[in-house]
């Protein structure tokens, strides 16, 4: 791609929806369309734009062993094309029939003014290697999957793939995959088992060369795509490498509706705070809200409704506030058509979302007088105002007094309440709650 710069595709943290938190491995075309339609109608005007299909979209049997506690069916015969590349399962994505792949669905999502994303596991299908199935090469040389597969590079939690060797024909395989994704109209690719290859604790960044091959494949395919790496925790010593080749990288393992995980995120954000910027966004994972987990239940039971998000309203507000001021990617985890009014209000507060688009880095400035209170600050480019978010991480009510900068502070604005507070500088915070303020100098 002429004059390609991977930062251009994500000048701000990407905002969208991901199917995983609600649908697990089971999402189908009708459900993706319903979520896209909801986003276009209710969220697009606030900046939400990516519709991302998560793991196992090529497996026609995904979810059928949920009752047995099996998330990923061992050695499943998922769908591939003549070059060992995954293609959508037609029983779940009927518009893909006839070799069309995800193009009809991507075209529909684009027609709504949105962007389309998919999840892939790094590597090449194991059964393609076992059966010596062909791959597409740049020079027509007959190469089979086993010749580029690394059987010593596998996922700890998913049985589908072998890693790809760092070699010319390994690059050809990734080039051919992303050539296909470009033909489909893919705008966002989440690559899994690559940010931290946790099968190998002594070498958690063992897929470093595959990250480079995938980044090269995006550059070679002729279409801009956001590159998102999972799972975490990302390896801080490799921050420079993530920033050179990816747009997003997960700084945590899967994040769920558990206060302990949310509280721990403050420390992770502090570690990564100096590595945010144009095209480079440390990723706190999805925003779980409202209803979750339907795809983990019995798919044949009408009683399966998933579960209600366990976060309190205060905790949900704290989550969205931290992600926003830290400038993490914002990916909603739920079934959008079921969003309740409160959850929708979190996702459509333009004053909160503006923090996420602020071009300057935020930083954590913990209170020197109260270890239970964490403060995040982000200066505004006009040098006339700044954001200050105050978080009560304790289980007790806390009274917090602002340590205001020198100047006139007659305009302290509460971003969640959407009202000016005058020169008020003392706040009472309920457990696990926060205040998001914009302070004019």
Kindly label every feature range from the protein language model.
Residues 114-129, 215, 219-236:
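Aromatic-lined carbohydrate-recognition surfaces of secreted/lumenal glycan-active proteins
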Residues 14-19, 49-54, 115-120, 187-192, ...:
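Structural recognition of the beta-strand scaffold that forms the well-ordered cores
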Residues 160-165, 172, 220, 224-335:
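Glycan-recognition surfaces
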Residues 1-33, 38:
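N-terminal module-boundary/linker segments of secreted carbohydrate-active enzymes
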Residues 423-441:
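C-terminal beta-strand-rich structural cap/linker in extracellular carbohydrate-active enzymes
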Residues 40-203:
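Aromatic-lined carbohydrate-binding/catalytic grooves of carbohydrate-active enzymes
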Residues 318-366:
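Catalytic cores of secreted or luminal carbohydrate-active enzymes
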Residues 317, 323-326, 331-333, 369-407:
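Carbohydrate-binding surface patches
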